Structure formats: structure tokens, C-alpha cells
Amino acid sequence: DRYRTTVAYAEQKNAKEKIKILHTMGVETICCPDEKNQIDLKKLMVNLGNRGIDSILLEGGGTLNDSALRAGIVKEVQAFVAPKLFGGVAGKTPVEGIGVELPSEAVELKYTDICQIGEDIRIKCQVCDKKQEESCLQES
């Protein structure tokens, strides 16, 4: 099967029963906890690479997005903007976490494509490698 579901997890109480259920449904599981018993994203990428998987779609909330960016496993970002404003002091952001104090510490992106899909706008960006400054110079 070209498309298969894989679930990564860190050890948790009562996980064995859930894992059994997933296996009976044909879902593959990968256990790769870090020292805080959270999923070690770098270890997960190595594991998936060893299985011949060279790209993934990471869909999640701001905390997962922050963890993935900090782990250095993100090469491309796709953001969708809908013609709606929500606002609010406690509003969720695409990247949660502790943030950065200075603009120079921010993750830099380079636009690779912008298009309209229905009423939404999709923005694709390459994540810049700060070690290779020229990889993300914006063309004028």
C-alpha cells in the first residue's frame, strides 16, 4: 500500500492497549520518546528515513509546529489564509512556544509560491538555512 498510516508516540500509561487496537486496524506505530517522554522528532525522521519515507505532512497545532521548527526538521512551510479575522488576546497562533526576543532570531522563510485556492490563499515558503545565508536572499 503506497499510502499508509503511521502513528508516532512516546511511552504513556495504558498505551499498550491503544497500540494493539491500532495494529488490528493496520496502522503502523513508532515509539521514539525523548528524555521528557515526548516524541523525539529528529529520531522519528531518522526512523522514517530508514523506512524509505523522505517527506511527511506535519499537521498540528502551534506547539507541534514550534517543536518541529526547533528540531530543524522543517524544510517547507505551507500556510493557508482565509478571508476571516478572529482576533482575541488568547487567540491561537500557527507557531506557539517561547518565541524569539529579536527579529534576527526568527526562522527566516523564502516565498516559493503564492496562489488562490477557492476563497483561501496558499503561501508556500522554503525554510532558510541560517548557515547558508545566500540560500534565502530575496530576489529584487
Regions found by a protein language model. Give the residues of each.
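Enzymes that bind and transform nitrogen-containing heteroaromatic metabolites
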Residues: 1-140
